[in-house]
């Protein structure tokens, strides 16, 4: 069937790969886990993930459905960013999805679903540092980590948090202090500290949070950064070279000439103004 659509999105997969390369220049030697939740921010989770798998170390998703859709498409690690519904844990573990533990109840549910005949379940302990969306208080991390270590069916694969305001260094510093409390407590308990991750796109380029062992790159890899971020000096060049991977294109369906003072659109939201031209009217294209 002939495609008659008048507007479409074009996704530049090579631009995403280049942007990830720029992220690496900022965070190396830290590893890069690419966030592909919400259809890779609208860019298409499966085609994007296939294209970038050679240049990333892992993938991050938000829902178990996303994880299960992605699993047959890529061979690298897939990390959930939110707790898995307990009834879905057996399927998640069957497909080697890495699971966040945000409470003692989460750990108990994983232990109930874990099997002796499978590789150890890789879990990441989430630390509540101020985001307010759940997580272990720093003082509770040791108990949950010790329970994980004691279970041969489990592997402590990560310690993580998320800074909610990377544009505000004092707020981020306070969160990092709480994250460090958890890290120090593990060391004092002689529990090996697993790979740590806290930086998302904002933190990668502001330098407000350390790269630690790996970063979770989100919208930056698609060529977008929030306005007003106080960029770290050593990240400014890379930030300036990021390129949006998505283009919205459309075919014109009509052309018209609008005289000065004429309006366009519902409510006359645009008014022709001929201050900068000697023409008698503005050229308007409807797309």
Features from the language model and the residues they span:
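Conserved small/polar residues in nucleotide/adenosyl-binding loops
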Residues: 276-283
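Active-site-proximal beta-alpha core segment in soluble small-molecule metabolic enzymes
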Residues: 3, 7-10, 15-18, 30-197, ...
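Glycine-rich phosphate/diphosphate-binding loops that line cofactor/substrate pockets in enzymes
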Residues: 23-28
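Glycine-centered small-residue hotspots that permit tight backbone geometry or close packing
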Residues: 42-44, 261, 281
């Amino acid at each position: 069937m002939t495609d008659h659509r008048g507007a479409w999105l074009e996704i530049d997969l090579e631009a995403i790969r280049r942007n990830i390369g720029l992220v690496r220049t900022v965070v190396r030697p830290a590893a890069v886990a690419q966030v592909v939740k919400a259809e890779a921010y609208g860019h298409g989770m499966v085609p994007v993930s296939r294209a970038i798998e050679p240049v990333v170390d892992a993938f991050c998703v938000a829902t178990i459905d996303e994880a299960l859709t992605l699993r047959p498409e890529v061979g690298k690690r897939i990390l959930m960013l939110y707790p898995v519904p307990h009834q879905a844990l057996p399927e998640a573990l069957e497909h080697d999805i890495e699971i966040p533990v945000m409470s003692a109840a989460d750990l108990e549910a994983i232990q109930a679903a874990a099997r002796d005949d499978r590789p150890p379940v890789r879990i990441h302990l989430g630390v509540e540092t101020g985001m307010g969306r759940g997580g272990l208080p720093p003082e509770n991390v040791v108990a949950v980590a010790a329970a994980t270590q004691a279970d041969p069916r489990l592997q402590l694969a990560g310690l993580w948090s998320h800074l909610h305001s990377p544009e505000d260094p004092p707020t981020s510093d306070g969160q990092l202090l709480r994250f460090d409390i958890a890290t120090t407590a593990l060391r004092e308990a002689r529990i090996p500290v697993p790979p740590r991750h806290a930086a998302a796109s904002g933190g990668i380029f502001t330098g407000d949070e350390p790269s630690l062992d790996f970063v979770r790159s989100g919208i930056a890899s698609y060529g977008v950064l929030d306005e007003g971020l106080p960029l770290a000096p050593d990240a400014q060049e890379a930030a300036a070279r990021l390129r949006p991977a998505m283009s919205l294109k459309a075919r014109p369906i009509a052309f018209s000439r609008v005289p000065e003072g004429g309006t366009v659109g519902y409510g006359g939201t645009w008014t022709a103004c001929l201050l900068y031209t000697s023409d008698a009217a503005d050229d308007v294209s409807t797309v």
